[in-house]
Amino acid sequence: MSNLNVTALIGEMAQTKSDSLEILTNIKNIHDVLSASPTNQNLPAEFRKISVPMIYSAWESHFTASIAVCFRALKDINKSANEHSSTIRAIWLQQESFFSKYIDMIKNIYDIDSHKSLSEKMTNMKRKVRKGHFKLTTDVLDSIDTFNSTGLNKQVNVDDLVMTFANVNKVVTEMNMDVIGLDHGSLDLSQLDALVGLRNAFGHGQFTTNVGKRQFLQMLSYADQLVNGLYQEVEVWLSHLDSELKDTHVDSWRCDTPCNISFSHKHI
């Protein structure tokens, strides 16, 4: 029996959408008030500059929360890890202490010899892979077998699974959506890198950059579209996941490639 509560997850995501859209609305309202004021006409222009990071933040906040909701949904499904896609397993595997320990060992072996030639590295590699390393590798393989045959670790903080790399730009957005199985083609990501770039410019003190009123309003509208578009895509994904889980004729809720499922009926 799955512990998936789609209604609660959609409700949680709807709240993050509402919070982000409220920020965008407030930014526009403040700008309208400043623009209507007869005194100090420089204020609207300065406000547009300092608002850019907030406009971007409205997008990032909703994005990270929405992706985390998807991971929470996958965590709540009572399926063994090997019934999930390789990308989902890779995300969860990176959180396992045994895997991190093994990666650290491999990095240790190579980092020590980083200045040496490839032939020297390989020679030293043979010497370094001693009994302890062999034992650790064996333990890791056993642990991976156990990992694959049991459910995804429910103790993992799903917020830590979201890959942001400091900026949620076009590549990062597509990467996270691909991992889960969301259609990033449903979003218009054509202006996202420009928004991130402008946000970073102001974040690094490039205050001479000007943001015109038309550009400002376009950014607000674009961020609004991104937030709503992602919400709709995740809502569809959650609803589809819920439907597949309830379909007793489907052996697994997911397929790496499009599934052609046919059913045979025996008549007695």
Model-assigned labels for residue ranges:
Residues 64-67, 100, 107, 238, ...:
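Amphipathic alpha-helical interaction segments
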Residues 1-53, 65-91:
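Charged alpha-helical initiation segments
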Residues 24, 55-56, 133, 206:
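Enrichment for repetitive, rod-forming helical segments
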Residues 2-29, 156-268:
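Polyanionic, low-complexity intrinsically disordered segments
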Residues 52, 57-61, 230:
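Extended alpha-helical coiled-coil scaffold domains characteristic of the BAR superfamily
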Residues 32-33, 104-124, 228-231, 246-257:
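Hydrophobic transmembrane alpha-helix bundles
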Residues 55, 67-181:
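Helix-loop junctions and short alpha-helical segments
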